[in-house]
UniProtKB/Swiss-Prot annotation:
Modified residues (Phosphothreonine): T174, T427
Protein name from the UniProt record: Nucleoprotein
Purpose of the protein: Packages the positive strand viral genome RNA into a helical ribonucleocapsid (RNP) and plays a fundamental role during virion assembly through its interactions with the viral genome and membrane protein M. Plays an important role in enhancing the efficiency of subgenomic viral RNA transcription as well as viral replication.
InterPro entries: N_prot_C_CoV, N_prot_N_CoV, NCAP_bCoV, Nucleocap_CoV, Nucleocapsid_C, Nucleocapsid_N
Major localization listed first in the record, in broad terms: virion
Basic and acidic residues: bias regions: 422-439
Compositional bias ranges of the Basic residues kind: 266-276
Organism: Bovine coronavirus (strain LY-138) (BCoV)
Residues modified as Phosphoserine: S167, S191, S390, S423
GO cellular component, as recorded: host cell endoplasmic reticulum-Golgi intermediate compartment; host cell Golgi apparatus; ribonucleoprotein complex; viral nucleocapsid
Top-level taxonomy: Viruses, Riboviria, Orthornavirae, Pisuviricota, Pisoniviricetes
Amino acid sequence: MSFTPGKQSSSRASSGNRSGNGILKWADQSDQSRNVQTRGRRAQPKQTATSQQPSGGNVVPYYSWFSGITQFQKGKEFEFAEGQGVPIAPGVPATEAKGYWYRHNRRSFKTADGNQRQLLPRWYFYYLGTGPHAKDQYGTDIDGVFWVASNQADVNTPADILDRDPSSDEAIPTRFPPGTVLPQGYYIEGSGRSAPNSRSTSRASSRASSAGSRSRADSGNRTPTSGVTPDMADQIASLVLAKLGKDATKPQQVTKQTAKEIRQKILNKPRQKRSPNKQCTVQQCFGKRGPNQNFGGGEMLKLGTSDPQFPILAELAPTAGAFFFGSRLELAKVQNLSGNLDEPQKDVYELRYNGAIRFDSTLSGFETIMKVLNENLNAYQQQDGMMNMSPKPQRQRGQKNGQGENDNISVAAPKSRVQQNKSRELTAEDISLLKKMDEPYTEDTSEI
């Protein structure tokens, strides 16, 4: 008994695209017994991954049952935790949930400015015993292959799964069981780039690779590989950015003027909608740290959500549903302190909430989360304590810098008592000289 993902189990002999000798015929391979010509054009199925290209022949594709996972951040490893990583497929039991993710190295292309851009790879899932590594045993160390299996699967035997026929079977949008931790820096095709940050079931209700949406090419003037490729959207986006004078690979330079505009734009939002960053710090958005706002310290106060440690904390943030339905809410009217006295006063309310976020040591990244929390919870108390222990000396009004600070510092002695400006008592010799100075002057007339 063989299983078909997305369908009820069926026999291998039921495949309508197989010849009598049991060899699978791909849609782009020549088959004289079938007429696929329509108005001079030939239908071509979408390729999901390719194997090696034989000399003198077309690229033979291996069709995955699922949509791909694309990397969008360099330097991120593709990996799943043990027991995770096998996509959900109706009709496939847990005992057959085993296989591998295959890295498809996409080609580079030339942008409008003449530079070569290498597209980041895309990964596709194949059941054990199928795809480009059908003959390899589970767990074999192969570059570009990551093995995954459920806890109920026997990895010593191939999965009893039919190969996908793109002419009759559409690709299934990739999604995982609840609790699956997706690789960071990757997104599921069609699910948006927020998918890697979600620890719950991936929301990949997206476009599926469909045999009905076939790329058309002129049979007389074009080769079979000249249709629309999965990389064309990235190429078009890069060409548009190049025409606009922007480079998608280079970060935009932030000037003082743009930083001021960004900060003002953030501050114009309601307080609960602000996201502090490098241009608008935590203190500018929410005020100084204290007993009521006791989170943040060091670099996180400067960088806000731009801090490299913040994304792992965002995993703990509640959803809107959890906020409203999992918290104790209280509505209170407060005094309006904004606006001028001559302006009409507005009624101001506060929706106060009290709740908790519960997690345990099995949470992915638990040690890092605890480290970041311990460094930032009540960090203002440590900063205030350091300021009280070593206060900056205050200079008195009218006193020059350095005056009165070091009274015991020895200096060079003056050259004379006059420079010292010190008084002393007169000696007998001094008094005698003063008396002589007071006597009238008489000319000496004695002769020699």
